[in-house]
């Protein structure tokens, strides 16, 4: 089976006029349970299951790989609708979209791994985000090299270091760890 045959039904069957209606319904459903996650602090797994059922976790995965092939500008409408219902879910979804929008153009990832991450998002709703912020460095947006070290071993790579957080970490399948190699 090719990756393109894994595309969720929603991305194949909903026309643009109906998409706004679908997003409004999703917003309402997410809003109905937002208080549960606000009060408990739990990861909103059911929200991501719902988004996956609608093909929205793979929205920025290229069409050739089974995703929606959407640009970040197009994904903005989905983010707005999700944020209207449940902002924490929207923040994690933003990270998913950002990672997938850059992943397939990255030559620092082996092709087989890039394809696997995309396939996992399409098929299983797998989430990805970056681990970049460190105790001493803070956010890398200010410059500097990470203290996290990646060393090649006979078995692959060994990564050691400490990250402070990653948005959505409790529900991520994939972690893109920012490190320097030695």
What label would you give each PLM region?
Residues 162-182:
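A short core secondary-structure module
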Residues 1-95:
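Amphipathic, small/basic residue-rich leader segments at the start of a protein or domain
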Residues 37-42, 47, 129, 133-134, ...:
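Residue-level signal for functionally critical sites in structured catalytic/ligand-binding pockets
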């Amino acid at each position: 089976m090719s990756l393109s045959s894994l595309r969720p039904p929603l991305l194949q069957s909903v026309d643009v006029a109906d998409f706004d209606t679908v997003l409004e319904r999703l917003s309402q459903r997410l809003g109905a349970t937002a208080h549960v996650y606000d009060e408990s602090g739990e990861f909103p797994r059911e929200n991501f299951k719902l988004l996956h059922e609608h093909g929205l976790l793979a929205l920025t995965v290229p069409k050739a790989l089974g995703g929606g092939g959407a640009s970040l500008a197009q994904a903005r409408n989905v983010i707005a609708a999700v944020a209207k219902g449940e902002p924490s879910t929207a923040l994690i979804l933003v990270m998913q979209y950002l990672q997938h929008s850059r992943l397939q153009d990255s030559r620092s990832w082996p092709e087989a791994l890039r394809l696997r991450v995309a396939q996992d998002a399409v098929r299983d709703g797998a989430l990805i985000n970056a681990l970049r912020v460190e105790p001493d460095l803070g956010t890398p947006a200010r410059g500097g090299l990470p203290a996290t070290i990646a060393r090649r071993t006979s078995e692959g790579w060994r990564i050691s270091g400490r990250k402070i957080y990653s948005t959505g970490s409790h529900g991520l399948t994939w972690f893109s760890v920012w490190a320097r190699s030695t």
